[in-house]
Structure formats: structure tokens, C-alpha cells
Curated annotation (Swiss-Prot):
Organism: Streptococcus equi subsp. equi (strain 4047)
Zinc-finger in keyword set: no
Quaternary organization: Part of the 50S ribosomal subunit. Forms a bridge to the 30S subunit in the 70S ribosome.
Record field: compositional bias (Basic residues): 259-277
Protein name in UniProt: Large ribosomal subunit protein uL2
GO BP: cytoplasmic translation
UniProt xrefs under SMART domains: Ribosomal_L2, Ribosomal_L2_C
PROSITE patterns, alphabetized: RIBOSOMAL_L2 (PS00467)
Domain of life of the source: Bacteria
Upper classification of the organism: Bacteria, Bacillati, Bacillota, Bacilli, Lactobacillales
One GO MF term attached to the UniProt entry: rRNA binding
Segments of this protein annotated with the region Disordered: 219-277
Length: 277
């Protein structure tokens, strides 16, 4: 999918870019796989903001995505490649030979009419899903499970990929895009290939209104707030932070403080941390 550059007809259009959606084959989603999605605007059940900078934006329907890929041995045909407003990756509508329809994350190179299949005996081909233990070393994968049968949780964003490095007992070593090397149970499934729509990260939003269409509200610096709104607020003019270290709006240390639990059970499954040289 290419990048479309706009002419600077207005200040908002200057430097604005978008995807050309050349890979998208239909603009009408499969109605049976849509669910209504209520706009929470970052509020919880008490009406309090729990996630800042969310609200407004265009109405959306949620597309039910098959992250489990557990219909073993049943072949499916790719019918369409579609846009999904709820994620950066595109999605593909597949029709199984037993009549079931499903959406999957569209990997790079997947085309309409292509046949895909899941299961331990599936070929190492883009779009096929297999247990990690059945995937050869060096293969690029995405949509990786962390618990067998739970569905893919890792490597689902546009352009993301991971690589199978080897096997240690019942675990398989996988290198994630961050550089982290992690041990994952060999019975967990992954899909062969890289997630498509990799040029999505190159898009220049161009103007504030386009962020609002996406439901993203402005982020205001703490230093321009009042003291009752933020620890950095107050003072005359461009005042410094006035504390030993920068703080979050709730007074906790920000910028550089490690937040990972040192006693996390998954620590023993990390072979190499993402920030190790």
C-alpha cells in the first residue's frame, strides 16, 4: 500500500499524507461479523476519566477477528482485504469450506483467492497458522499466542513481525520486533508472515482535526496548567518543574522510572530484555 501526498492547497493539507488503500478490495464489511461499539470517551462505569485524551471521533463498528485460528484442516479462501478502523493492520475476510466466515489479520502478500489453512500439518506459507513447535527456525511470524488456545496476543500491529530462533525443551525462542527474545510454549500458535499495511507508520496526520476524527483529544503539557491540575503547573511565565524529577499528573515519578514488576512470573521466560545491548 502506497503513500498519497496532498498538494498544499490549505495550511492543513501542507505536508499531509495518507494511505492510498490500493490493497483494499471492498468498502462494505461482512454484516454478520460486526458488533456495535459504544464510545466510552476514556470513562469508567463511574463516569470518571481513566484514560486521558480520548473522546469524540467517527462512529465505528467492531469487527470480530479470529485470533485463535483453531479450525484445523479446514481450508479457507480469502474473499476480501478490508480496512479496519479499530486497528492499524488491514483485515481479510475468509470463507471456510464448511460455510463459516471469519476475519483474520491480513499479512503482507495475502491476496484475494488465496487458500489458507490452520493446524500442525499446514504448509509454511503466508497466512497459515501452526503451533510454534512446527514452524522452522528463521521463519517470520505474527499473531502469536502466549497461552495455548487463548488466541494471538503478540505481534498484531501493522508491519509487525517476529522470528523463530530455536527450541528449548517444550519452549520455542522467539525474537520480537523490540529485540526482546522470549520463550513461548511450543503448543502456542502463530501465523506465518509479516503483518501487512507496513507503511501506515509513515502517514503524516497533517492537522489537528484529523486526530479528532480518530477520537484522539489534545495532550496538554503540565507546565501550562494550574498548580491544582498538575505538579508542574503554576509559576510566572515559563517556570521550571520545581521538583527533583518530572512527575505524572498524579505526583508519581515520570520519564525513566522502571515500572515493570521485578517479581513478575514471566521474567523467567525472558531470555533477552529489549533494552539490552
Amino acid at each position: 500500500m502506497g503513500i498519497k501526498v496532498y498538494k498544499p492547497t490549505t495550511n492543513g493539507r501542507r505536508n499531509m499524507t495518507s494511505l492510498d488503500f490500493a490493497e483494499i478490495t471492498t468498502s462494505t464489511p461482512e454484516k454478520s461479523l460486526l458488533v456495535s461499539l459504544k464510545n466510552k470517551a476514556g470513562r469508567n462505569n463511574n463516569g470518571r476519566i481513566t484514560v486521558r485524551h480520548q473522546g469524540g471521533g467517527h462512529k465505528r463498528h467492531y469487527r470480530l477477528i479470529d485470533f485463535k485460528r483453531n479450525k484445523d484442516g479446514v481450508e479457507a479462501v480469502v474473499k476480501t482485504i478490508e480496512y479496519d478502523p479499530n486497528r492499524t493492520a488491514n483485515i481479510a475476510l475468509v470463507h471456510y469450506t464448511d460455510g463459516v466466515k471469519a476475519y483474520i489479520i491480513a499479512p503482507k502478500g495475502l491476496e484475494v483467492g488465496q487458500r489458507i489453512v490452520s493446524g500442525p500439518d499446514a504448509d509454511i506459507k503466508v497466512g497459515n497458522a501452526l503451533p510454534l513447535v512446527n514452524i522452522p527456525v528463521g521463519t517470520v511470524v505474527h499473531n502469536i499466542e502466549l497461552k495455548p488456545g487463548k488466541g494471538g496476543e503478540l505481534v498484531r500491529a501493522a508491519g509487525a513481525s517476529a522470528q523463530v530462533l530455536g527450541q528449548e525443551g517444550k519452549y520455542v525462542l522467539v525474537r520480537l520486533q523490540s529485540g526482546e527474545v522470549r520463550m513461548i510454549l511450543g503448543t502456542c500458535r502463530a501465523t506465518v508472515g509479516t503483518v501487512g499495511n507496513e507503511q501506515q507508520s509513515l502517514v503524516n496526520i497533517g492537522k489537528a482535526g484529523r486526530s479528532r476524527w480518530k477520537g484522539i483529544r489534545p495532550t496538554v503539557r503540565g507546565s501550562v496548567m494550574n498548580p491544582n491540575d498538575h505538579p508542574h503547573g503554576g509559576g510566572e511565565g515559563k517556570a521550571p518543574v520545581g521538583r527533583k524529577a518530572p512527575s505524572t499528573p498524579w505526583g508519581k515519578p515520570a520519564l525513566g522510572l522502571k515500572t515493570r514488576n521485578k517479581k513478575a512470573k514471566s521474567n523467567k521466560l525472558l531470555v533477552r530484555r529489549r533494552n539490552e545491548k
